[in-house]
Regions:
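Acidic/histidine-rich catalytic neighborhood of metal-dependent amide-processing enzymes
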Residues: 107-179, 253, 378
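Buried hydrophobic packing segments
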Residues: 41, 111-121, 152, 208-211, ...
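Acidic-glycine-rich active-site phosphate/pyrophosphate-binding loop
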Residues: 80-95, 160, 177-187, 341-342, ...
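Active-site metal-coordination/substrate-binding segment of hydrolases
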Residues: 70-136, 156, 365
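A non-catalytic alpha/beta surface segment that caps or lines the substrate-entry region
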Residues: 20-23, 29-71, 91-93
Length: 380
């Protein structure tokens, strides 16, 4: 149960959270280019009493609290990148009830809540039960390929006993399994030519279209408890209206929360690529993203972590938690056998659209929920 001191702190810090969101939203942070937002976060942490803060090679801002050379660790993270490629500040506005901006919920508001909640424990020099890493991590979105989370697990994996990531739009949500994915950039090349003079030559757009049509004939594997999907998200190609296309490409993916189903999809896609190569068409299939499913996590420890999150949701919100699979920064620790969950510290909608928004009235509950999860790792 949160103490009166914690509750008062959250009430007093609500405007701090809002101001952090405003300032972070003004700093563009596309995946792989989070430098400016990382520098801002590092400066904020240092100005607010964090003594051991560094930006690693993956552009993670890592705040180490009471970390020794060999003690066990817990990780709390929220990502700095947004799904949008913009390198100039994006439109931001607010009214009495909401803030509106691309990326404002995913994951800026979650990050702001993490930062302010972490400040409570650090400024009061609370004794931790283990080492704590507060991380503003990079590259969660899209082709960021979970680079930031991978680096944390690479650097600290054997010492991490539990792992939390704050992401999402519903405070009741507890992500309890990892959705893995493979993402390809597929390029088809043919001889092409002039649309009149070389009529009859092979057209790369035609063969790519045919390949896409073949993909969409697949029936995904059916397995109890598993969900498997596929998608072609981007197609490009051609030169002009009077040119037989020499080159066309697509970005495609498949996903599943089951490792066997994911491998079934890999086999199917690879067979498609080989089929078109056998037609004499050049097919280049580049794996541009790979997110793993859950690995062999000790079930008893994982169940205990989920139970604590469920208890916090019931205590703070008076609501039942919503369990489900998702693709988040938690994929990486789960694949490594580390108990991990993803919860939300914000309520919003329109994620991954230019109309994204958050509910301001939900921020205090998001902070209370996040602080309740952190509280278990500190002495009373």
């Amino acid at each position: 149960m949160l103490t009166e001191e914690m509750l008062s702190y959250i009430q007093e810090s609500t405007e701090d959270i809002r101001q952090l969101i405003r300032e972070l939203c003004a700093i563009p942070a596309p995946s792989h280019h989070e430098e400016k937002r990382a520098e801002y976060c590092k400066a904020w942490f240092e100005a607010n009493g964090f003594a051991d803060v560094q930006i690693d090679e993956a552009l993670n801002v890592v705040c180490r609290y009471q970390v020794t050379d060999d003690n066990d660790l817990v990780v709390f993270m929220a990502h700095t990148d947004t799904v949008f490629p913009d390198t100039e500040p994006m439109p931001f506005r607010e009214d009495e009830k909401k803030m509106y901006a691309p990326g404002v919920c995913d994951d800026t508001a979650n990050l702001a809540v993490l930062m302010v909640c972490a400040r409570y424990f650090v400024q009061r020099k609370k004794q931790a039960k283990c080492g704590v890493l507060f991380v503003a991590n990079s590259c969660e979105e899209g082709l960021g390929n979970l680079k930031g989370s991978r680096r944390i697990v690479q650097d600290y994996g054997s010492r991490i006993r539990e792992f939390y990531t704050f992401d999402g739009t519903d405070l009741r949500r507890v992500v309890t399994s990892a959705v893995g994915s493979h993402r390809y950039r597929v390029t088809v090349r043919t001889e092409g030519g002039h649309s009149y003079g070389a009529f009859g030559n092979r057209n790369a757009i035609y063969y790519l279209s045919s390949m896409i049509d073949t993909i969409y004939t697949m029936k995904v594997p059916q397995k109890e408890g598993a969900k498997t999907t596929y998608n072609v998200g981007v197609i490009e190609g051609g030169t002009s209206v009077n040119t037989i296309a020499q080159e066309a490409s697509m970005l495609c993916e498949y996903r599943s929360n089951d490792r066997e189903c994911l491998e079934t999809m890999r086999t199917f896609f690879e067979k498609i690529f080989e089929t078109y190569r056998a037609m004499g068409v050049e097919v280049e299939a580049e794996l541009v993203g790979e997110r793993p499913c859950s690995g062999d996590v000790p079930q008893e420890k994982w169940d205990a972590l989920i139970a604590r999150a469920d208890s916090a949701v019931r205590e703070i919100l008076g609501a039942e938690p919503l369990h489900g699979p998702s693709s988040t920064d938690a994929n990486i620790p789960l694949a490594a056998g580390i108990p991990a969950i993803c919860t939300s510290a914000a309520v919003g909608r329109g994620c991954h659209t230019r109309q994204e928004e958050i509910d301001l009235d939900a921020l205090p509950d998001g902070a209370r929920l996040s602080m309740r999860l952190m509280q278990d790792y500190f002495e009373d």
